Each structure stands twice: as C-alpha cells, then as structure tokens.
Amino acid sequence: FGNLSSAQAIMGNPRIRAHGKKVLTSLGLAVQNMDNLKETFAHLSELHCDKLHVDPENFKLLGNVLVIVLSTHFAKEFTPEVQAAWQKLVAGVANALSHKYH
C-alpha cells in the first residue's frame, strides 16, 4: 500500500482509497449473497491467505470498525436491531474471508 507512516499519509494514499472502495463494494456483494458468503468470498479468502498473508483477525477488526463508523454516521437510524444485523453481516464476511486459513 506504500507509505503508511502517518495518518496524513494514509488518508492521502490512492491505493488505500481504492482498497476501501473494493471493501465497501464487497460488502454490497455480501448483502446480495448472504446465504452463500463462503462461496462468494472463496477467491478473496484464498488471495488474502496464500498471496497477501493477511492476519485473519484483521477481517474481524475491520468489520467492527465499519459497524462503529456506520453507527456514528447514522446515529438515530442505527437502532440496536440495525446494529445487530450489521454485526452479523460483517462477522459472516470475516468468517468467509478466514475460511482458507482453517
């Protein structure tokens, strides 16, 4: 991802921005394929495990961060039920992305 030495470097990093868009697009894909997350994310699981060597705990961490950001952004609309649904979705995605590691 290049220079990640400071918050400013990260915020201005086009590769980070592009990856963020991919992550959010993948969440949309997850919503469309909630009953088949393992298969939907099989290729990404393999990529992150075998090629990128990403610690699978990072998938859980990112999911939790996304839920926090959504709750902050949507405040009143982010009811306990909405929060539970998002937590279930990001946990399912994290599990699917971690599948290749098992």
Swiss-Prot record:
Domain of life here? Eukaryota
Q: Which Pfam families match?
A: Globin (PF00042)
Give the record's GO biological process terms.
hydrogen peroxide catabolic process
Q: Which InterPro entries match?
A: Globin (IPR000971), Globin-like_sf (IPR009050), Globin/Proto (IPR012292), Hemoglobin_b (IPR002337), Hemoglobin_oxygen_transport (IPR050056)
A GO MF term: heme binding
Keywords of the record, alphabetical order, are: Heme, Iron, Metal-binding, Oxygen transport, Transport
> In the UniProt record, does the keyword Cell wall biogenesis/degradation occur?
no
Please state every residue range assigned to the domain named Globin: 1-102
Cellular component, GO annotation: blood microparticle; haptoglobin-hemoglobin complex; hemoglobin complex
Q: Which residues bind heme b?
A: 19, 48
Q: What does this protein do?
A: This is an embryonic beta chain.
Q: How does it assemble?
A: Heterotetramer of two alpha chains and two beta chains.
Q: Which family does it belong to?
A: Belongs to the globin family.
Put simply, this protein is called: Hemoglobin subunit beta-Z
Q: Which organism is it from?
A: Mesocricetus auratus
Q: Which gene codes for it?
A: HBBZ
